[in-house]
Amino acid sequence: MKKNINSFEKIIGIKFNNQNLLLQSLTHKSNNPLNNNEKLEFLGDRVLGLVISKNLYKLFPKDKEGDLDKKLASLVNKKRCVEISNYLSLEDYVLVGDNKDNSKIENK
């Protein structure tokens, strides 16, 4: 890891009780095929969708379901996540295998 995990906690404004969980969430399968972030990513995608949906529901109480769905899709997608990851310099914290380049997280 190029930078330490405590500096990442400061950037995102969250102090983890279990830093091993944070470390796992930052571990790409190329670094550790058995203990990596894939299952946490699955769970995180659902949590992110729920949190954003709840906020959209509160912010736009008169919008129809289809309009809320379009807003959700514009906020929760790979392109937006890549933008946020790059803004946070996530590539400085992700653990990848020797054959994987994490110099920039790209929208692929």
Please provide the spans of the model-predicted regions.
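RNase III-family endoribonuclease catalytic core
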Residues: 1-108
